[in-house]
Amino acid sequence: MYHIWIKFLAAWIFLKRFNGVHVMQAKAPMYRNEPFLVFWNAPTTQCRLRYKVDLDLKTFHIVSNANDSLSGSAVTIFYPNHLGVYPHIDDRGHFFHGIIPQNESLTKHLNKSKSDINRIIPLKAFHGLGVIDWENWRPQWDRNWGSKNVYRNRSIQFARDLHPELSEDKIRRLAKKEYEKAAKSFMRDTLLLAEEMRPDGYWGYYLYPDCQNYDYKTKGDQYTGKCPEIEMSRNDQLLWLWRDSTALFPNVYLEIILRSSDNALKFVHHRLKEAMRIASMAREDYALPVFAYARPFYAYTFEPLTQEDLVTTVGETAAMGAAGIVFWGSMQYASTVDSCQKVKKYMNGPLGRYIVNVTTAAKICSRVLCRKNGRCVRKHSDSNAFLHLFPESFRIMVYANATEKKVIVKGKLELENLIYLRENFMCQCYQGWKGLYCEEYSIKDIRKI
C-alpha cells in the first residue's frame, strides 16, 4: 500500500510540474545565470600536456577540470577502486572485498572512504559534481539479472553457510533481505559521508535513475522508448536513495545502431522524463538537479554524433529542464596526437558550436522569460520544442589569433522569437522565487546558505 501511495504522489507531482500551472522549484544553478551547464568528464590531460593539443573546452562554454583531467574541482568521478572497499566482482572475474556487501565491514569501508575523499577532493569547499560509479551490482535484489545474478547466488550461499538448518525457501528469503539491507547501507552511508565531508558538492550515483528501455534492438519500428512500468515502480522503491542524493546522473549514451533515428530521440526522451519524475519526488522543497551523462561519440566507437543526435542528446536534455549534461569519454580520446586532433576538430566544428547554441539559448530564455530567476522548461514535455538560437536573429562567430580563440554570439531576440518561447516554454523558478515568470521574491522559500 505504501508503494502505491508513493507512485500516485510521484505521478501527481510530475503532472503538476510539466502540464499544470505550478512547477516545482529548482535549486539555484551551480554558476550564477547559467541555467544549463555542459561538463567535460574525459581523461584528456595528455592532449594538453603531452601532445600540446588544446581542445578549446572553455572557448565553447564547457566546464572542465584543470588540464582537462578526469577528476577535479568541476567534476570528480569515483570508480569502484577509488572509494572505500566496494565489494564486487570485476569484468575479468576477479573478487574484491568479500564480493557481496553483507560480507564486508561497512565501518572499514567508510573509514577508507573518508581517507579517499580527503585525498581525491582535498578542497573542503568543493562545489562540483561528485559522481559515484558503482555498476557491478544493484541495491535491489530483483534488478540483479544477467551477469549480476552472481550476487544473488553468492548471497544465497552466504546465508546457507550461516544457517544450514533453514529450508531452501527460508534461505532465499533471508539472503534477499540481508543483501538488500547491506546494499542499502553501503550506498546510503557512502553518500551521506561524502555530503557531510563536502557539503557544497552535487552528490549522486551514476546511472541512477535508470529506465531499462534498451529494447530498441529487438523492437525496431515498434519501439516506444517508454520505461517499463515495473522499472518505474522499482525506482519508486528507491526513495531512500533519492532523498539522500543532491543530484541525479542518468545516462543518455547512444549506440551506433540508433544513429540519426527516431528511436534515438525516444530512448533519450523517456530516460530524461523518468529522471525528471524522480527529481520531483525526492524532496519537498525543490526538484533535484539532473545532470545527464552523454558521450560525444557513439558508445564503443570513435565516431562523432551526427548533428541530429547532438540535438537528441544535448538539445533534449536542455529542453526537458535538466541542470546540465556531462560528456564522458575514454582513454582513447587522448591515446595519440591524432586522437586528440580528432576530438579538437569535432569540438571546433559541430559539437562546440551546438553547445554554444544551446547554452546561450538557455540563458536568453531564462533572462527574457524568467528574469534570470529560473530556467526554461518545455510546457509539454513530449513536444518537439527546443532551446535553440533563432537562426534568422543570431549568429555564432569564432575569432582566433596566435594567442587566443573566442566565440561571440551576435544578434537580438525579435518579437516572434519571444512569442515562440512563451508558447512553448515555462519557467521553473529557483528557490526564493515564484510566479509565472519568477517575478515574485519569496523569502520563506530561500534555502539556508
Swiss-Prot record:
It comes from the Eukaryota. One of its GO terms (molecular function) is hyalurononglucosaminidase activity. It is found in: Secreted. SUPFAM superfamilies: (Trans)glycosidases (SSF51445). InterPro entries: Aldolase_TIM (IPR013785), Glycoside_hydrolase_SF (IPR017853), Hyaluronidase (IPR018155). Gene3D superfamilies: Aldolase class I. GO terms for biological process: carbohydrate metabolic process; hyaluronan catabolic process. Pfam families: Glyco_hydro_56. Its main location: secreted. Transmembrane segments: none annotated. Disulfide bonds join 47-340, 211-227, 365-376, 370-427, 429-438. It is an enzyme of class 3 (hydrolase). Residues 1-23 form the signal peptide. Expressed by the venom gland. Its EC number is 3.2.1.35. Keywords: Disulfide bond, EGF-like domain, Glycoprotein, Glycosidase, Hydrolase, Secreted, Signal. Glycans are attached at residues 67, 103, 111, 153, 357, 401. It catalyses: Random hydrolysis of (1->4)-linkages between N-acetyl-beta-D-glucosamine and D-glucuronate residues in hyaluronate. Residues 427-438 form the EGF-like domain. GO terms for cellular component: cytoplasmic vesicle; extracellular region. The active site is at residue 135. Snake venom endo-hyaluronidase that degrades hyaluronan to smaller oligosaccharide fragments. In venom, it is not toxic by itself, but increases the diffusion of other venom proteins by degrading the extracellular matrix. In addition, it displays antiedematogenic activity. Monomer. Belongs to the glycosyl hydrolase 56 family. This is Hyaluronidase-1. The lineage of its organism: Eukaryota, Metazoa, Chordata, Craniata, Vertebrata.
